[in-house]
């Protein structure tokens, strides 16, 4: 899996891990911040969230076009600097009016910086495999690169949660997902008697505040201010992670400097060095059209996947906050301690290394690491309290954990199928991924039956008498991850492989532009989050995923011609 890969892959993957850690720390709490700080309802928060995600994934198209002219490395470095300024702006607490426009400016800068950084870094990874010595390892490389992204993402919700708990605890408050919305109702004078009594009861019991004796309106203001400030400082974590990414990038630059230029520069450099290993592909106009058409068809399909997948920061977070039990017990506690998850990931990789090792020394080392990982996970687990409270953003650590943990199994499966000549093509994997994404929302739909609508629950927080088990969302994320592993790294690899050489940056940007459209469409379910039953909301996503799968299978012959 890791053998015979160019060293530049690991350097670029680590640089991306740092940047993604900061980004996913922000995403884990962004919609919660919008509702806590500004009192936005789900529809308003959905509009801002989806527009931001659209910018994040659309601007790589512009970044790719610029990189095709000026070079990939220059755009990556510029992107890091621009993102840093954006996250810094978002991390500074301010009053409501200033905070709103400061946030808009920050989101614009983060989107622009990501547009320059994200796609071009992935093009550089793909360019490493234009060398004939590594060309056969392209799919594996993108799976490893994708895994590295998710290592950063796995720790992000824990970082955000730690900051929230620390800041609120310092101010004498305890987080409760029901309170921000009700606090704004109290401030506006629209809170129902049931919600007012609920908050007063929680204050009197000490469940959400320590020794608070003031009136409810003052409490609401102070609670919102404390929570909002904790989110600001959570965004500041992204600044630190970008500094780490920059250090890794510049310190390891010698390992990938040969792929920093645009495609024309790279070919000229290879010719000057008489490097016969670099693949210089010349396409006829007809072949170019066929490839671009195939890519556009794939782009159409992935729109619907990302619309379904990126509910994680929106409706799935709402579901975690409003409909899911906020206390965990038993074995489920393991999933909400990121260090236990990390030890399990290490255990999986060490076991793979053990069975793949060719020497007794390597087997011994892998075996020792596996044993220590098991001991580490066990020692943490047995020290956990019998039950503890979880925050909604913590559910977002499951998807990246599953990606990291399942990637070796995915690579092993497709490697075995490849050796027997039965490995599905990238387009076929994408189609299967759409079917599995539909299955994930079928699971969530069944678990949501009989629950009150979001609008009814907002009016009376006591209506939900039997919240969903955390395992329902964990299972949903697991099935979505199976879909993601079939679609995302394979799609990126497909673009890298099929894109005409002179259009690589633009085509990778096209992939992200399609993702942007899907992310903008995320708000559809967010805006429907109100009077519609939950099963109807999930049913919309099921239907769209199934339609996309049918479309993909209908175009399969055309797509497989260019593979």
Task: Describe the residue ranges of each PLM region.
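Central cavity-lining transmembrane alpha-helices of secondary-active solute carriers
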Residues: 49-68, 154-156, 397-414
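Intracellular loop-helix junctions on the cytosolic face of multi-pass helical membrane proteins
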Residues: 1-7, 131-139, 164-387, 410, ...
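Cytoplasmic membrane-interface "Motif A"-like loop-to-helix N-cap segments
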Residues: 68-80, 136, 356-367, 416-435
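Hydrophobic core of transmembrane alpha-helices in multi-pass small-molecule transporters
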Residues: 17, 99-120, 453-486
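Helix-loop boundary and gating motifs at the non-cytosolic
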Residues: 3-53, 309-319, 378-388
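Hydrophobic alpha-helical transmembrane and interfacial-helix anchor sites in secondary transporters
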Residues: 66, 125, 163, 413, ...
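C-terminal ends and interior cores of transmembrane alpha-helices
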Residues: 79-98, 375-385, 432-462
